[in-house]
């Protein structure tokens, strides 16, 4: 169902990152009411740039590390909801690419996303009298087919796709819809230099970047298009400047 971002309130976790910042720039062009950015490190220059792009949009920043206990996330969300009353969209975008850091990769890329999602359900779940909401989770094309030299990173992204697809199926119960946007290799600092698991391929970044990649702006433009298309359960591939809905094959069914 098509969705207009005009006058909406959006929370963007990691909205100042490589793809995140360019996506934030595209979002403010859509005349949001509020863009609330949650990120680990404040970037006043980037916040000022976002405000300058569209002064009609209120842009606010809160420091947030997705690896904090879920109670801290809930406390922060209470502050945000008290200020805005309603939130329409949550974008979960935190991610690291470093297979030396196994525990942190899982904590940031998957556990943090699950916890942030779980926390906002306290405010959105229609079983608790909530209004529902929209969750946009950033996965990766490696969630479809791994970069096998970084199996930890790729595994977390596969988990994001599976978790989000489950959320989408739960929408009739919770009132919360969900979909993933899954970028291909994108020109950001994330991929300039990173470590493979157990150092199985020391040149993994260089080899990857030898192939065609997309700009973060091209990715951001399609990212916002996916938000506007607002298809519950969609698995979007954002690769080489294109936006494509992935058809997921079913190989097993729980039957429940």
UniProtKB/Swiss-Prot annotation:
Q: Coiled coil located at which positions?
A: none
Decide whether keyword Protein biosynthesis is in the record. no
| Residues the entry annotates as binding substrate | 140
Gene Ontology biological process terms from the UniProt entry: alcohol metabolic process
Instruction: Cite the EC number.
Output: 1.1.1.1
The protein's matches in PROSITE patterns, at most eight in alphabetical order, are given as: ADH_SHORT
- Per its UniProt record, what InterPro entries does this chain match? ADH_Drosophila-type, NAD(P)-bd_dom_sf, Sc_DH/Rdtase_CS, SDR_fam
What is an example of a GO molecular function annotated in this UniProt entry?
alcohol dehydrogenase (NAD+) activity
Catalyses which reaction(s) = a primary alcohol + NAD(+) = an aldehyde + NADH + H(+); a secondary alcohol + NAD(+) = a ketone + NADH + H(+)
Q: Name one GO cellular component term.
A: cytosol
Which keywords does the record carry? Answer: NAD, Oxidoreductase
Residues at which NAD(+) binds: 12-35
Q: According to the UniProt record, what class of enzyme is this? A: oxidoreductase
Q: Which SUPFAM superfamilies match?
A: NAD(P)-binding Rossmann-fold domains
Report the active site residues.
153 (proton acceptor)
Q: How does it assemble?
A: Homodimer.
Family to which this protein belongs: Belongs to the short-chain dehydrogenases/reductases (SDR) family.
Q: What is this protein called?
A: Alcohol dehydrogenase
């Amino acid at each position: 169902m098509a969705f207009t971002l005009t006058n909406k309130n959006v929370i963007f976790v990691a909205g100042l990152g490589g793809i995140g910042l360019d996506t934030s720039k595209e979002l403010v062009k859509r005349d949001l009411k509020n863009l609330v950015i949650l990120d680990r490190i404040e970037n006043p220059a980037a916040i000022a740039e976002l405000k300058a792009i569209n002064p009609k949009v209120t842009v606010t920043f809160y420091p947030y590390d997705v690896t904090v206990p879920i109670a801290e996330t809930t406390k922060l969300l209470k502050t945000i909801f008290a200020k805005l009353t309603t939130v329409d969209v949550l974008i979960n975008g935190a991610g690291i690419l470093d297979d030396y850091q196994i525990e942190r990769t899982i904590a940031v890329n998957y556990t943090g996303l699950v916890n942030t999602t779980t926390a906002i359900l306290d405010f959105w779940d229609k079983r608790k009298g909530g209004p529902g909401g929209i969750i946009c989770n950033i996965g990766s094309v490696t969630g479809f087919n791994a970069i096998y030299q970084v199996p930890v990173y790729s595994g977390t992204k596969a988990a994001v796709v599976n978790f989000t697809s489950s959320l989408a199926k739960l929408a009739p119960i919770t009132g919360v819809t969900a979909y993933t946007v899954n970028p291909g290799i994108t020109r950001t600092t994330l991929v300039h230099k990173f470590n493979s698991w157990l150092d199985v391929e020391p040149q993994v970044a260089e080899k990857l970047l030898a192939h065609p990649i997309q700009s973060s702006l091209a990715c951001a433009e399609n990212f916002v298009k996916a938000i506007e298309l607002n298809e519950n359960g969609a698995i979007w591939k954002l690769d080489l400047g294109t936006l494509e809905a992935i058809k997921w094959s079913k190989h097993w069914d729980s039957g429940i």
